[in-house]
From Swiss-Prot:
Gene from which the chain derives: rpsC
Protein name stated in the entry: Small ribosomal subunit protein uS3
Pfam families for this protein: KH_2 (PF07650), Ribosomal_S3_C (PF00189)
Family according to the record: Belongs to the universal ribosomal protein uS3 family.
Lineage top rank: taxon: Bacteria
Source organism per UniProt: Staphylococcus haemolyticus (strain JCSC1435)
Length: 217
């Protein structure tokens, strides 16, 4: 089971939290679709800003958005000009008051989405699929990853028959629920068609904190 399921979804509620932190009864469907529009809009607007993921919180008529990015300067802009433009566009998109918080990702080479998108971008520039995977693995291990696995699938090198090739280093314990495993997939549009990129990065175990109030202590 651990080999097939999305490692992030499997660990939600155990060592990972939801990326949408709100609850609604009647308006759930409309708010969910609004979330999807917000995420798609941010992805399109900040395509070059190395955005890893977006967290959304709601309170009354206010939306708090946390953007995790490897290039915070590009998101904020000179004197906050770019983030102000983004905030105004999101205000118009949602008809609500939007607050944006930009969080910098310091180690971009052990963030699965940024690694996957970097591999996809290099594949679009006709780089060797073997070399880009090995370079990504090397950089991640140097930054302290416990293990990494990458896979590229499709018409590799323009071959007539599609196939998948994967490389790994270290351990990636997909069945261990306390293992902090980051996963992402990306697509590369090449002249021979689409190539799929998958990345799993194991960053160590997240140990549960002991509850000191147990046993009447």
């Amino acid at each position: 089971m651990g080999q097939k399921i999305n490692p992030i979804g499997l660990r939600v509620g155990i060592i990972r939290d939801w990326e949408a932190k709100w609850y609604a009864e009647k308006d759930f469907a409309s708010l969910l679709h609004e979330d999807l529009r917000i995420r798609k809009f941010i992805d399109n607007e900040l395509k070059e800003a190395s955005v890893s993921h977006v967290e959304i919180e709601r309170a009354a008529n206010r939306i708090n958005i946390a953007i995790h990015t490897g290039k915070p300067g590009m998101v904020i802009g000179k004197g906050g000009s770019e983030i102000e433009k983004l905030r105004n566009k999101l205000n118009n998109l949602t008809d609500k008051k939007v607050h944006i918080n930009v969080i910098e990702i310091k180690k971009i080479d052990i963030d699965a989405r940024l690694v996957a998108e970097n591999i996809a971008r290099q594949l679009e520039n006709r780089a060797s699929f073997r070399r880009v995977q090995k370079q990504a693995i090397s950089r991640a291990m140097k930054l302290g990853a416990k293990g990494i696995k990458t896979q590229v699938s499709g018409r590799l090198g323009g071959a007539d028959i599609a196939r998948a090739e994967q490389y790994s280093e270290g351990t990636v314990p997909l069945h261990t629920l306390r293992a902090d495993i980051d996963y992402a997939h990306a697509e590369a549009d090449t002249t021979y068609g689409k190539l799929g990129v998958k990345v799993w990065i194991y960053r160590g175990e997240v140990l549960p904190t002991k509850n000191t109030s147990e046993g009447g202590k």
